[in-house]
A protein has these predicted regions:
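Macrodomain-like recognition of ADP-ribose-binding/processing modules
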Residues: 1-167
C-alpha cells in the first residue's frame, strides 16, 4: 500500500481535498508547496504530452530536481512514445535525487489548454497510480515507491475546479 500526500498550497484547494478525502486511509493533505515536504520518494508531474515542464507545479519540479530531469523525461517520451505521450498514460523515471528518487510523468493535456469538463484528470491520475503499481510489482524492496506526492492535477493551466480535481 502506498501513502498519498496531496500537495495543496492554495487554501481553497486544501479545503476541497479535505472534504473529498475526509474518510480516505493513507491520504494526507499538506497545505503547502511540495518542496516543503521532507519525506517522499515519488513526485507526480502532470506536464503535457511533450514533457514540457516549465509552468505551474512542473516549473517547481524542474527547479527542485534540475533541468536534467525534464531532458530525461523528454528523451523517454521520444524513445517510448515517438515524441508525444498520450494523455492517460504514465511512466516512472528516476529523478537523480537519492532522497526523492522517482517521478511519475502523467500528462493531463496534450498541449496547454483548459480541460475542465473532461476526464483527463481522472485518466492521468489513474495512469500514474497504475505506473506506480507496475513499478512496485517488479522493484526490490529498497526501490519500491512508498510515499507519493500528488499535485492538484489539472487545476493550474487546465483550470479544473479544486473539487473536481479531488474527485
Amino acid at each position: 500500500m502506498i501513502n498519498l500526500i496531496l500537495s495543496a498550497p492554495v487554501p481553497e484547494m486544501a479545503e476541497a481535498f479535505k472534504r473529498v478525502f475526509a474518510n480516505a486511509d493513507n491520504v494526507n493533505i499538506v497545505g503547502q508547496p511540495f518542496e516543503t515536504i521532507r519525506e517522499f520518494d515519488c513526485m507526480v508531474s502532470a506536464a503535457n504530452s511533450f514533457g514540457l515542464m516549465d509552468g505551474d507545479v512542473d516549473a517547481a519540479i524542474t527547479a527542485f530536481f534540475g533541468t536534467q530531469l525534464q531532458t530525461r523525461v523528454q528523451n523517454h517520451i521520444l524513445r517510448e512514445y515517438l515524441g508525444e505521450q498520450p494523455v492517460g498514460t504514465a511512466f516512472v523515471i528516476e529523478t537523480g535525487d537519492n532522497n526523492h528518487p522517482w517521478l511519475v510523468h502523467a500528462p493531463t493535456m496534450r498541449v496547454p489548454l483548459t480541460i475542465d469538463g473532461t476526464d483527463a484528470v481522472y485518466n492521468a491520475t489513474w495512469a500514474a497510480l497504475l505506473a506506480i503499481f507496475q513499478h512496485n510489482k517488479n522493484a526490490t524492496t529498497d526501490r519500491k515507491i512508498k510515499t507519493v506526492v500528488l499535485p492538484a492535477m489539472g487545476a493550474g493551466c487546465g483550470q479544473v475546479p479544486f473539487e473536481s480535481v479531488g474527485r
